[in-house]
């Protein structure tokens, strides 16, 4: 036990580095990041104040508190960074230019009809000044407005906003 107490600072440092590496390269769920930062903070605290928290129980308590503090400080900024990688208005950009098949009897520019895209039946209407499309015809997706596809009989090369 005496040998472990002499190297607790280095052990906390190694635990912190391992947790951060696991977060970066293996798990990537933000949990190990907070534990790693808590262990590194605990290592720094043990190095500077060895007599205050000499027992292992106190060090584990401080490790938990440091991890909680790092969680409170970094959770919301990291949550915004991780989950807001794409703009919500551009989230359907992979659909633009794809082909759909008319599923309802007709689809026109002033009434919503249904089209089949990638096996899913979706609501759609035609772009302004388009001739009505009949069942079975092929259309191209030129835009998305909410959960409704905007389609055209002609493929457009640019991603102009037709909404």
Swiss-Prot record:
The keyword Cell membrane applies. It comes from the Bacteria. The chain crosses the membrane at residues 7-27, 51-71. It is found in: Cell membrane. GO terms for cellular component: plasma membrane. The keyword Isomerase does not apply. It is a multi-pass membrane protein. Keywords: Cell membrane, Membrane, Transmembrane, Transmembrane helix. This is Uncharacterized protein RP252. It comes from Rickettsia prowazekii (strain Madrid E).
């Amino acid at each position: 036990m005496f040998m472990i107490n002499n190297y607790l600072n280095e052990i906390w440092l190694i635990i912190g580095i391992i947790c951060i590496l696991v977060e970066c390269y293996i798990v990537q769920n933000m949990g190990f990041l907070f534990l790693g930062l808590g262990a590194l903070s605990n290592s720094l605290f043990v190095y500077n104040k060895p007599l205050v928290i000499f027992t292992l129980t106190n060090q584990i308590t401080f490790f938990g508190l440091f991890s909680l503090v790092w969680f409170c400080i970094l959770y919301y900024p990291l949550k915004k960074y991780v989950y807001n990688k794409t703009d919500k208005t551009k989230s359907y950009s992979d659909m633009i230019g794809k082909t759909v098949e008319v599923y309802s009897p007709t689809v026109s520019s002033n009434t919503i009809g249904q089209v089949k895209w990638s096996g899913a039946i979706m609501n759609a209407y035609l772009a302004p000044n388009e001739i009505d499309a009949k069942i079975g015809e092929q259309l191209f997706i030129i835009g998305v407005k909410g959960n409704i596809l905007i389609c055209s009989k002609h493929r457009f090369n640019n991603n102009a906003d037709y909404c």
